Curated annotation (Swiss-Prot):
The gene is XOAT13. GO terms for molecular function: O-acetyltransferase activity; xylan O-acetyltransferase activity. It is a single-pass type II membrane protein. Belongs to the PC-esterase family. TBL subfamily. One of its GO terms (cellular component) is Golgi membrane. A motif (GDS motif) lies at residues 226-228. It is found in: Golgi apparatus membrane. Disruption phenotype: Stunted growth and reduced plant height. The double mutants tbl1 and tbl2 exhibit increased susceptibility to the bacterial pathogen Xanthomonas oryzae pv oryzae (Xoo). Glycans are attached at N153, N163, N189, N209, N255, N267, N372, N401, N442. Its main location: Golgi. This is Xylan O-acetyltransferase 13. The active site is at S228, D478, H481. A motif (DXXH motif) lies at residues 478-481.
Length: 502
């Protein structure tokens, strides 16, 4: 590029009539004359450079030519990058066709991938590695299929340490992870918790395939609706798919209580909507709320429903905010409105408030949901591990320093309310006669075992924990949410299996 530029400048210089002889300068003035006289240039009798009336025009012409060449090269470089990114997409699509045409007798575990030349992309993080089975290496279902085991209960099984196929992604490389669940980023050196795979008894979970899932979501919207544990699952899902989407073709957008992840390549959206009590409440602000002082509006859900009712897939959850934080804690329920002058405030048991919320949600779904379009899921209770004495530990440490799952089969914590899920199944069952099925994601039992998988003190909640807070795990260790990669990835494997195969 540079040799062509200099040749062009030389040609312009020649056309201007300026000759290329050497310039001869007089000796500089003596020391005593410094500052009194300017050095003057003299030339041979053939030299006319400094006196040429075309000198200014020559310089301007040269500068214009320089900028034209640089702009042209930059434009060609940008187009070349776009073309290579588009080529990556086309190669991936072609590879998917080839994989679909692969004979059924192909060997189990055979992998084919298309790796894009990374040197042509805008940044190292924009590397595109379209590998259709990258995350599926060590599971038992050879082609990511369902195995035909439609009666299999995935929720019954055991955790198997798997250093080959787990984790499904790197938390340090997921650009959309939240700091409150990024445990290895905030100092957790033990990463064993990332390598456990859930193995159901007598069957296998379909392998998660990010590109197939994104294809399923093409021109569709998946929305998670609920509390911070549901946001935990949403972040997990985004991390499970975002690695397979090049930079510039994905985006996270904040809009009040709604956070959207957009995959432009597929025109797919994966949303999280903050609605911890499902109904309208005084806790609807995702930042400003008080867990201990809660009021729900028993007859108001439309403000929330207008956000999620047209989605293709909806995953609700609501459990954490219905647990008692202390003895005697009640839920305040408001009927009517102050505007209409008929406001009435009651206090009910927490579980009764939960029933009020689910019945109102069910009533709305039955009257407004498009059963031919929208599939509905409800995530089971996510157990906390705040009382180490439940498994023989020290309550002062909560779940800090736990590195192994609980090995007691069918272990159930005394603090997990299984009756709430039974109530949810009963209430959602009233939609069946209307042709609306709410699929329960039975995640509770498998999560009960994982006392080792919480952020504890290895997190950031708006600001990093202080040394004093880190030294006081009985107050500041988070044993409710889940490190990522981790347990919520399995919840999403359940969701994937239902969406793709059932």
């Amino acid at each position: 590029m540079w040799s062509a530029l200099f040749s062009h400048l030389r040609e312009v210089h020649k056309r201007s009539g300026v000759k290329e002889e050497k310039l001869i300068m007089k000796s500089p003035p003596a020391a005593g004359e410094a500052g009194c006289h300017k050095p003057q240039a003299t030339a041979t009798n053939k030299m006319t450079v400094l006196q040429s009336p075309l000198g200014l025009r020559t310089i301007l012409t040269s500068l214009v030519a320089f900028f034209i060449v640089v702009s042209s090269v930059s434009l060609l470089f940008d187009r070349g990058q776009d073309a290579q990114a588009q080529l990556a997409v086309e190669q991936h699509q072609h590879q998917e066709v080839l994989l679909k045409q692969k004979p059924a007798s192909a060997a189990v575990g055979e992998q084919k991938s298309v790796v894009v030349d990374q040197s042509s992309l805008r940044s190292q993080e924009a590397q595109v590695q379209w590998t259709s089975e990258l995350q599926d290496v060590a599971t038992d279902s050879g082609d990511g299929g369902f195995d035909g085991e439609e009666d299999c209960n995935w929720s019954l099984g055991r955790w198997v340490y798997d250093n080959a196929s787990r984790p499904l992604y790197s938390g340090l490389k997921c650009s959309f992870i939240f700091d409150e669940v990024a445990c290895d980023k905030y100092g957790r050196n033990d990463t064993k918790y990332q390598h456990w795979r859930w193995q159901p008894h007598g069957c296998n979970l379909p392998r998660f395939n990010a590109t197939k899932f994104l294809e399923k979501l093409r021109n569709k919207r998946l929305v998670f609706v609920g509390d911070s544990v549901n946001r935990n699952q949403w972040v997990s899902m985004v991390c499970m798919v975002e690695h397979f989407i090049p930079d510039g073709r994905k985006m996270r957008v904040y809009n009040g209580s709604l956070i959207s992840f957009k995959a432009f390549e597929y025109n797919a959206t994966i949303d999280f909507y903050w609605s911890p009590l499902l109904l309208e409440s005084n806790s609807d602000n995702p930042i400003i709320h008080r867990v201990e002082y809660r009021i729900i509006r028993a007859d108001r859900i439309e403000k929330h429903a207008n956000v999620w009712k047209d989605a293709d897939f909806i995953v609700f959850n609501s459990y954490l905010w219905w647990r008692k934080q202390r003895d005697g804690m009640m839920m305040k329920v408001m009927y009517g409105s102050f505007e209409d002058g008929d406001a009435k405030l009651d206090e009910v048991q927490m579980v009764d408030g939960y029933e009020i919320a689910l019945k109102k949600l069910t009533e709305y779904l039955g009257a407004n949901i498009n059963k031919n379009k929208t599939r509905i899921f409800f995530a089971g209770s996510s157990p906390a591990h705040s009382w180490a004495s439940n498994w023989g530990g020290d309550d002062n440490n909560k779940c800090l320093n736990e590195t192994e799952p609980i090995q007691i089969e069918d272990y159930r914590s005394a603090t997990t309310d299984y009756g709430m899920m039974d109530k949810a199944k009963e209430i959602f069952g009233t939609l069946e006669p209307k042709g609306i099925h709410v699929q329960i994601l039975n995640i509770t039992q498998l999560s009960e075992y994982r006392k080792d998988a919480h952020p504890t003190i290895f997190r950031r909640q708006y600001v990093p924990l202080t040394k004093e807070q880190i030294a006081n795990p009985s107050i500041y260790a988070d044993c409710t949410h889940w490190c990522l990669p981790g347990v919520p990835d399995v919840w999403n494997e359940f969701l994937y299996a239902y969406i793709m195969h059932k």
